[in-house]
């Protein structure tokens, strides 16, 4: 999939939103990518995730035996990437504020894992998911996302990162947000903090 095709799919599904948003990272932005609107269509989810894993070098891809993504946003992404790779898919959840594998999910010692996300901004959720994988005995081989909106600022502790699309989107700390300065109030469309 080309960058233009990914953006077109997000636009077609009403998933590329403009306004004043409070992101899961705590940053503010005038653009929000609501991946759930794209992932609600199985064909779109399958196409995006197959393209994600196709971007991982063959030698690395062959070593992946499990895909893990943080709930909520990456549950479907993990599943579809696992299906595209022919491996199982797990997800992490918050327990006492920390990402962990629950529901009886286990990783074999040293099992090769691909950690996935729908969107990365600071990479915080991805790093938390990676820590949960490591704590469970897995080996993080790489990370991937449908869209990296970090402008290259995401760092995954040396693990290679293979986003399908790099999309520079403006973000601000709350104190520096021009939309807040103009009297606007951000909306929080993401899933972090939901109970």
Curated annotation (Swiss-Prot):
Please list the GO biological process terms of this entry.
'de novo' UMP biosynthetic process; pyrimidine nucleobase biosynthetic process
Copy the pathway line from the protein's UniProt record: Pyrimidine metabolism; UMP biosynthesis via de novo pathway; UMP from orotate: step 1/2
Q: Which UniProt keywords apply?
A: Glycosyltransferase, Magnesium, Pyrimidine biosynthesis, Transferase
Against InterPro entries, the record matches this protein to: OPRT, Orotate_PRibTrfase_bac, PRibTrfase_dom, PRTase-like
Report if keyword Transferase is assigned. Answer: yes
* Any GO MF annotation of the entry: orotate phosphoribosyltransferase activity
Q: Where is the signal peptide?
A: none
Would I find Glycosyltransferase among this entry's keywords?
A: yes
Leading EC class = transferase
Its Enzyme Commission number(s) read 2.4.2.10
Provide the family line. Belongs to the purine/pyrimidine phosphoribosyltransferase family. PyrE subfamily.
Q: This protein is called what?
A: Orotate phosphoribosyltransferase
């Amino acid at each position: 999939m080309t960058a233009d095709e990914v953006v077109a799919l997000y636009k077609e599904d009403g998933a590329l939103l403009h306004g004043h948003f409070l992101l899961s990272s705590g940053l503010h932005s005038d653009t929000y990518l609501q991946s759930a609107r794209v992932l609600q269509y199985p064909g779109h989810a399958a196409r995006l995730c197959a393209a994600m894993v196709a971007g991982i070098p063959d030698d690395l891809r062959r070593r992946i035996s499990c895909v893990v993504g943080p709930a909520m946003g990456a549950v479907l992404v993990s599943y579809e990437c696992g299906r595209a790779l022919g491996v199982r898919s797990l997800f992490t959840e918050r327990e006492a504020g920390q990402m962990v594998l629950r529901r009886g999910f286990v990783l074999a010692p040293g099992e090769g894992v691909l950690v996935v996300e729908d969107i990365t901004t600071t990479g915080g959720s991805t790093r938390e998911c990676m820590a949960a994988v490591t704590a469970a005995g897995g080996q993080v081989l790489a990370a991937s996302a449908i869209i990296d909106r970090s402008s290259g600022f995401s760092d995954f502790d040396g693990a290679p990162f293979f986003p399908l699309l790099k999309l520079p989107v403006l973000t601000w700390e709350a104190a520096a947000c021009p939309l807040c300065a103009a009297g606007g109030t951000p909306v929080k469309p993401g899933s972090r903090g939901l109970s």
